């Protein structure tokens, strides 16, 4: 993925959750998101992670 891409999660527990990719380091990313694990404000709640079960949207 690239910085600025919209990450879309799919699967039984995260279907449709979206986040914006803020950093990329090899196969790991960081994202900014809201409504993750009860957090209402936009922020980076996961740190570096290797995504699974996601696709990306690239805005023009």
Predicted regions mapped to residue ranges:
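...with weaker cross-activation on analogous glycine-rich loops/strands in unrelated enzymes
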Residues: 1-35
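Aromatic- and glycine-rich peptidoglycan recognition patches
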Residues: 24-60
């Amino acid at each position: 993925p690239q910085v600025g891409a919209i990450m879309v999660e799919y699967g039984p527990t995260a279907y449709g959750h979206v986040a914006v990719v803020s950093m990329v380091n090899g196969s790991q990313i960081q994202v900014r998101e809201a409504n993750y694990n009860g957090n209402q404000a936009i922020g980076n709640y996961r740190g570096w992670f290797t995504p699974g079960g996601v696709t990306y949207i690239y805005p023009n």
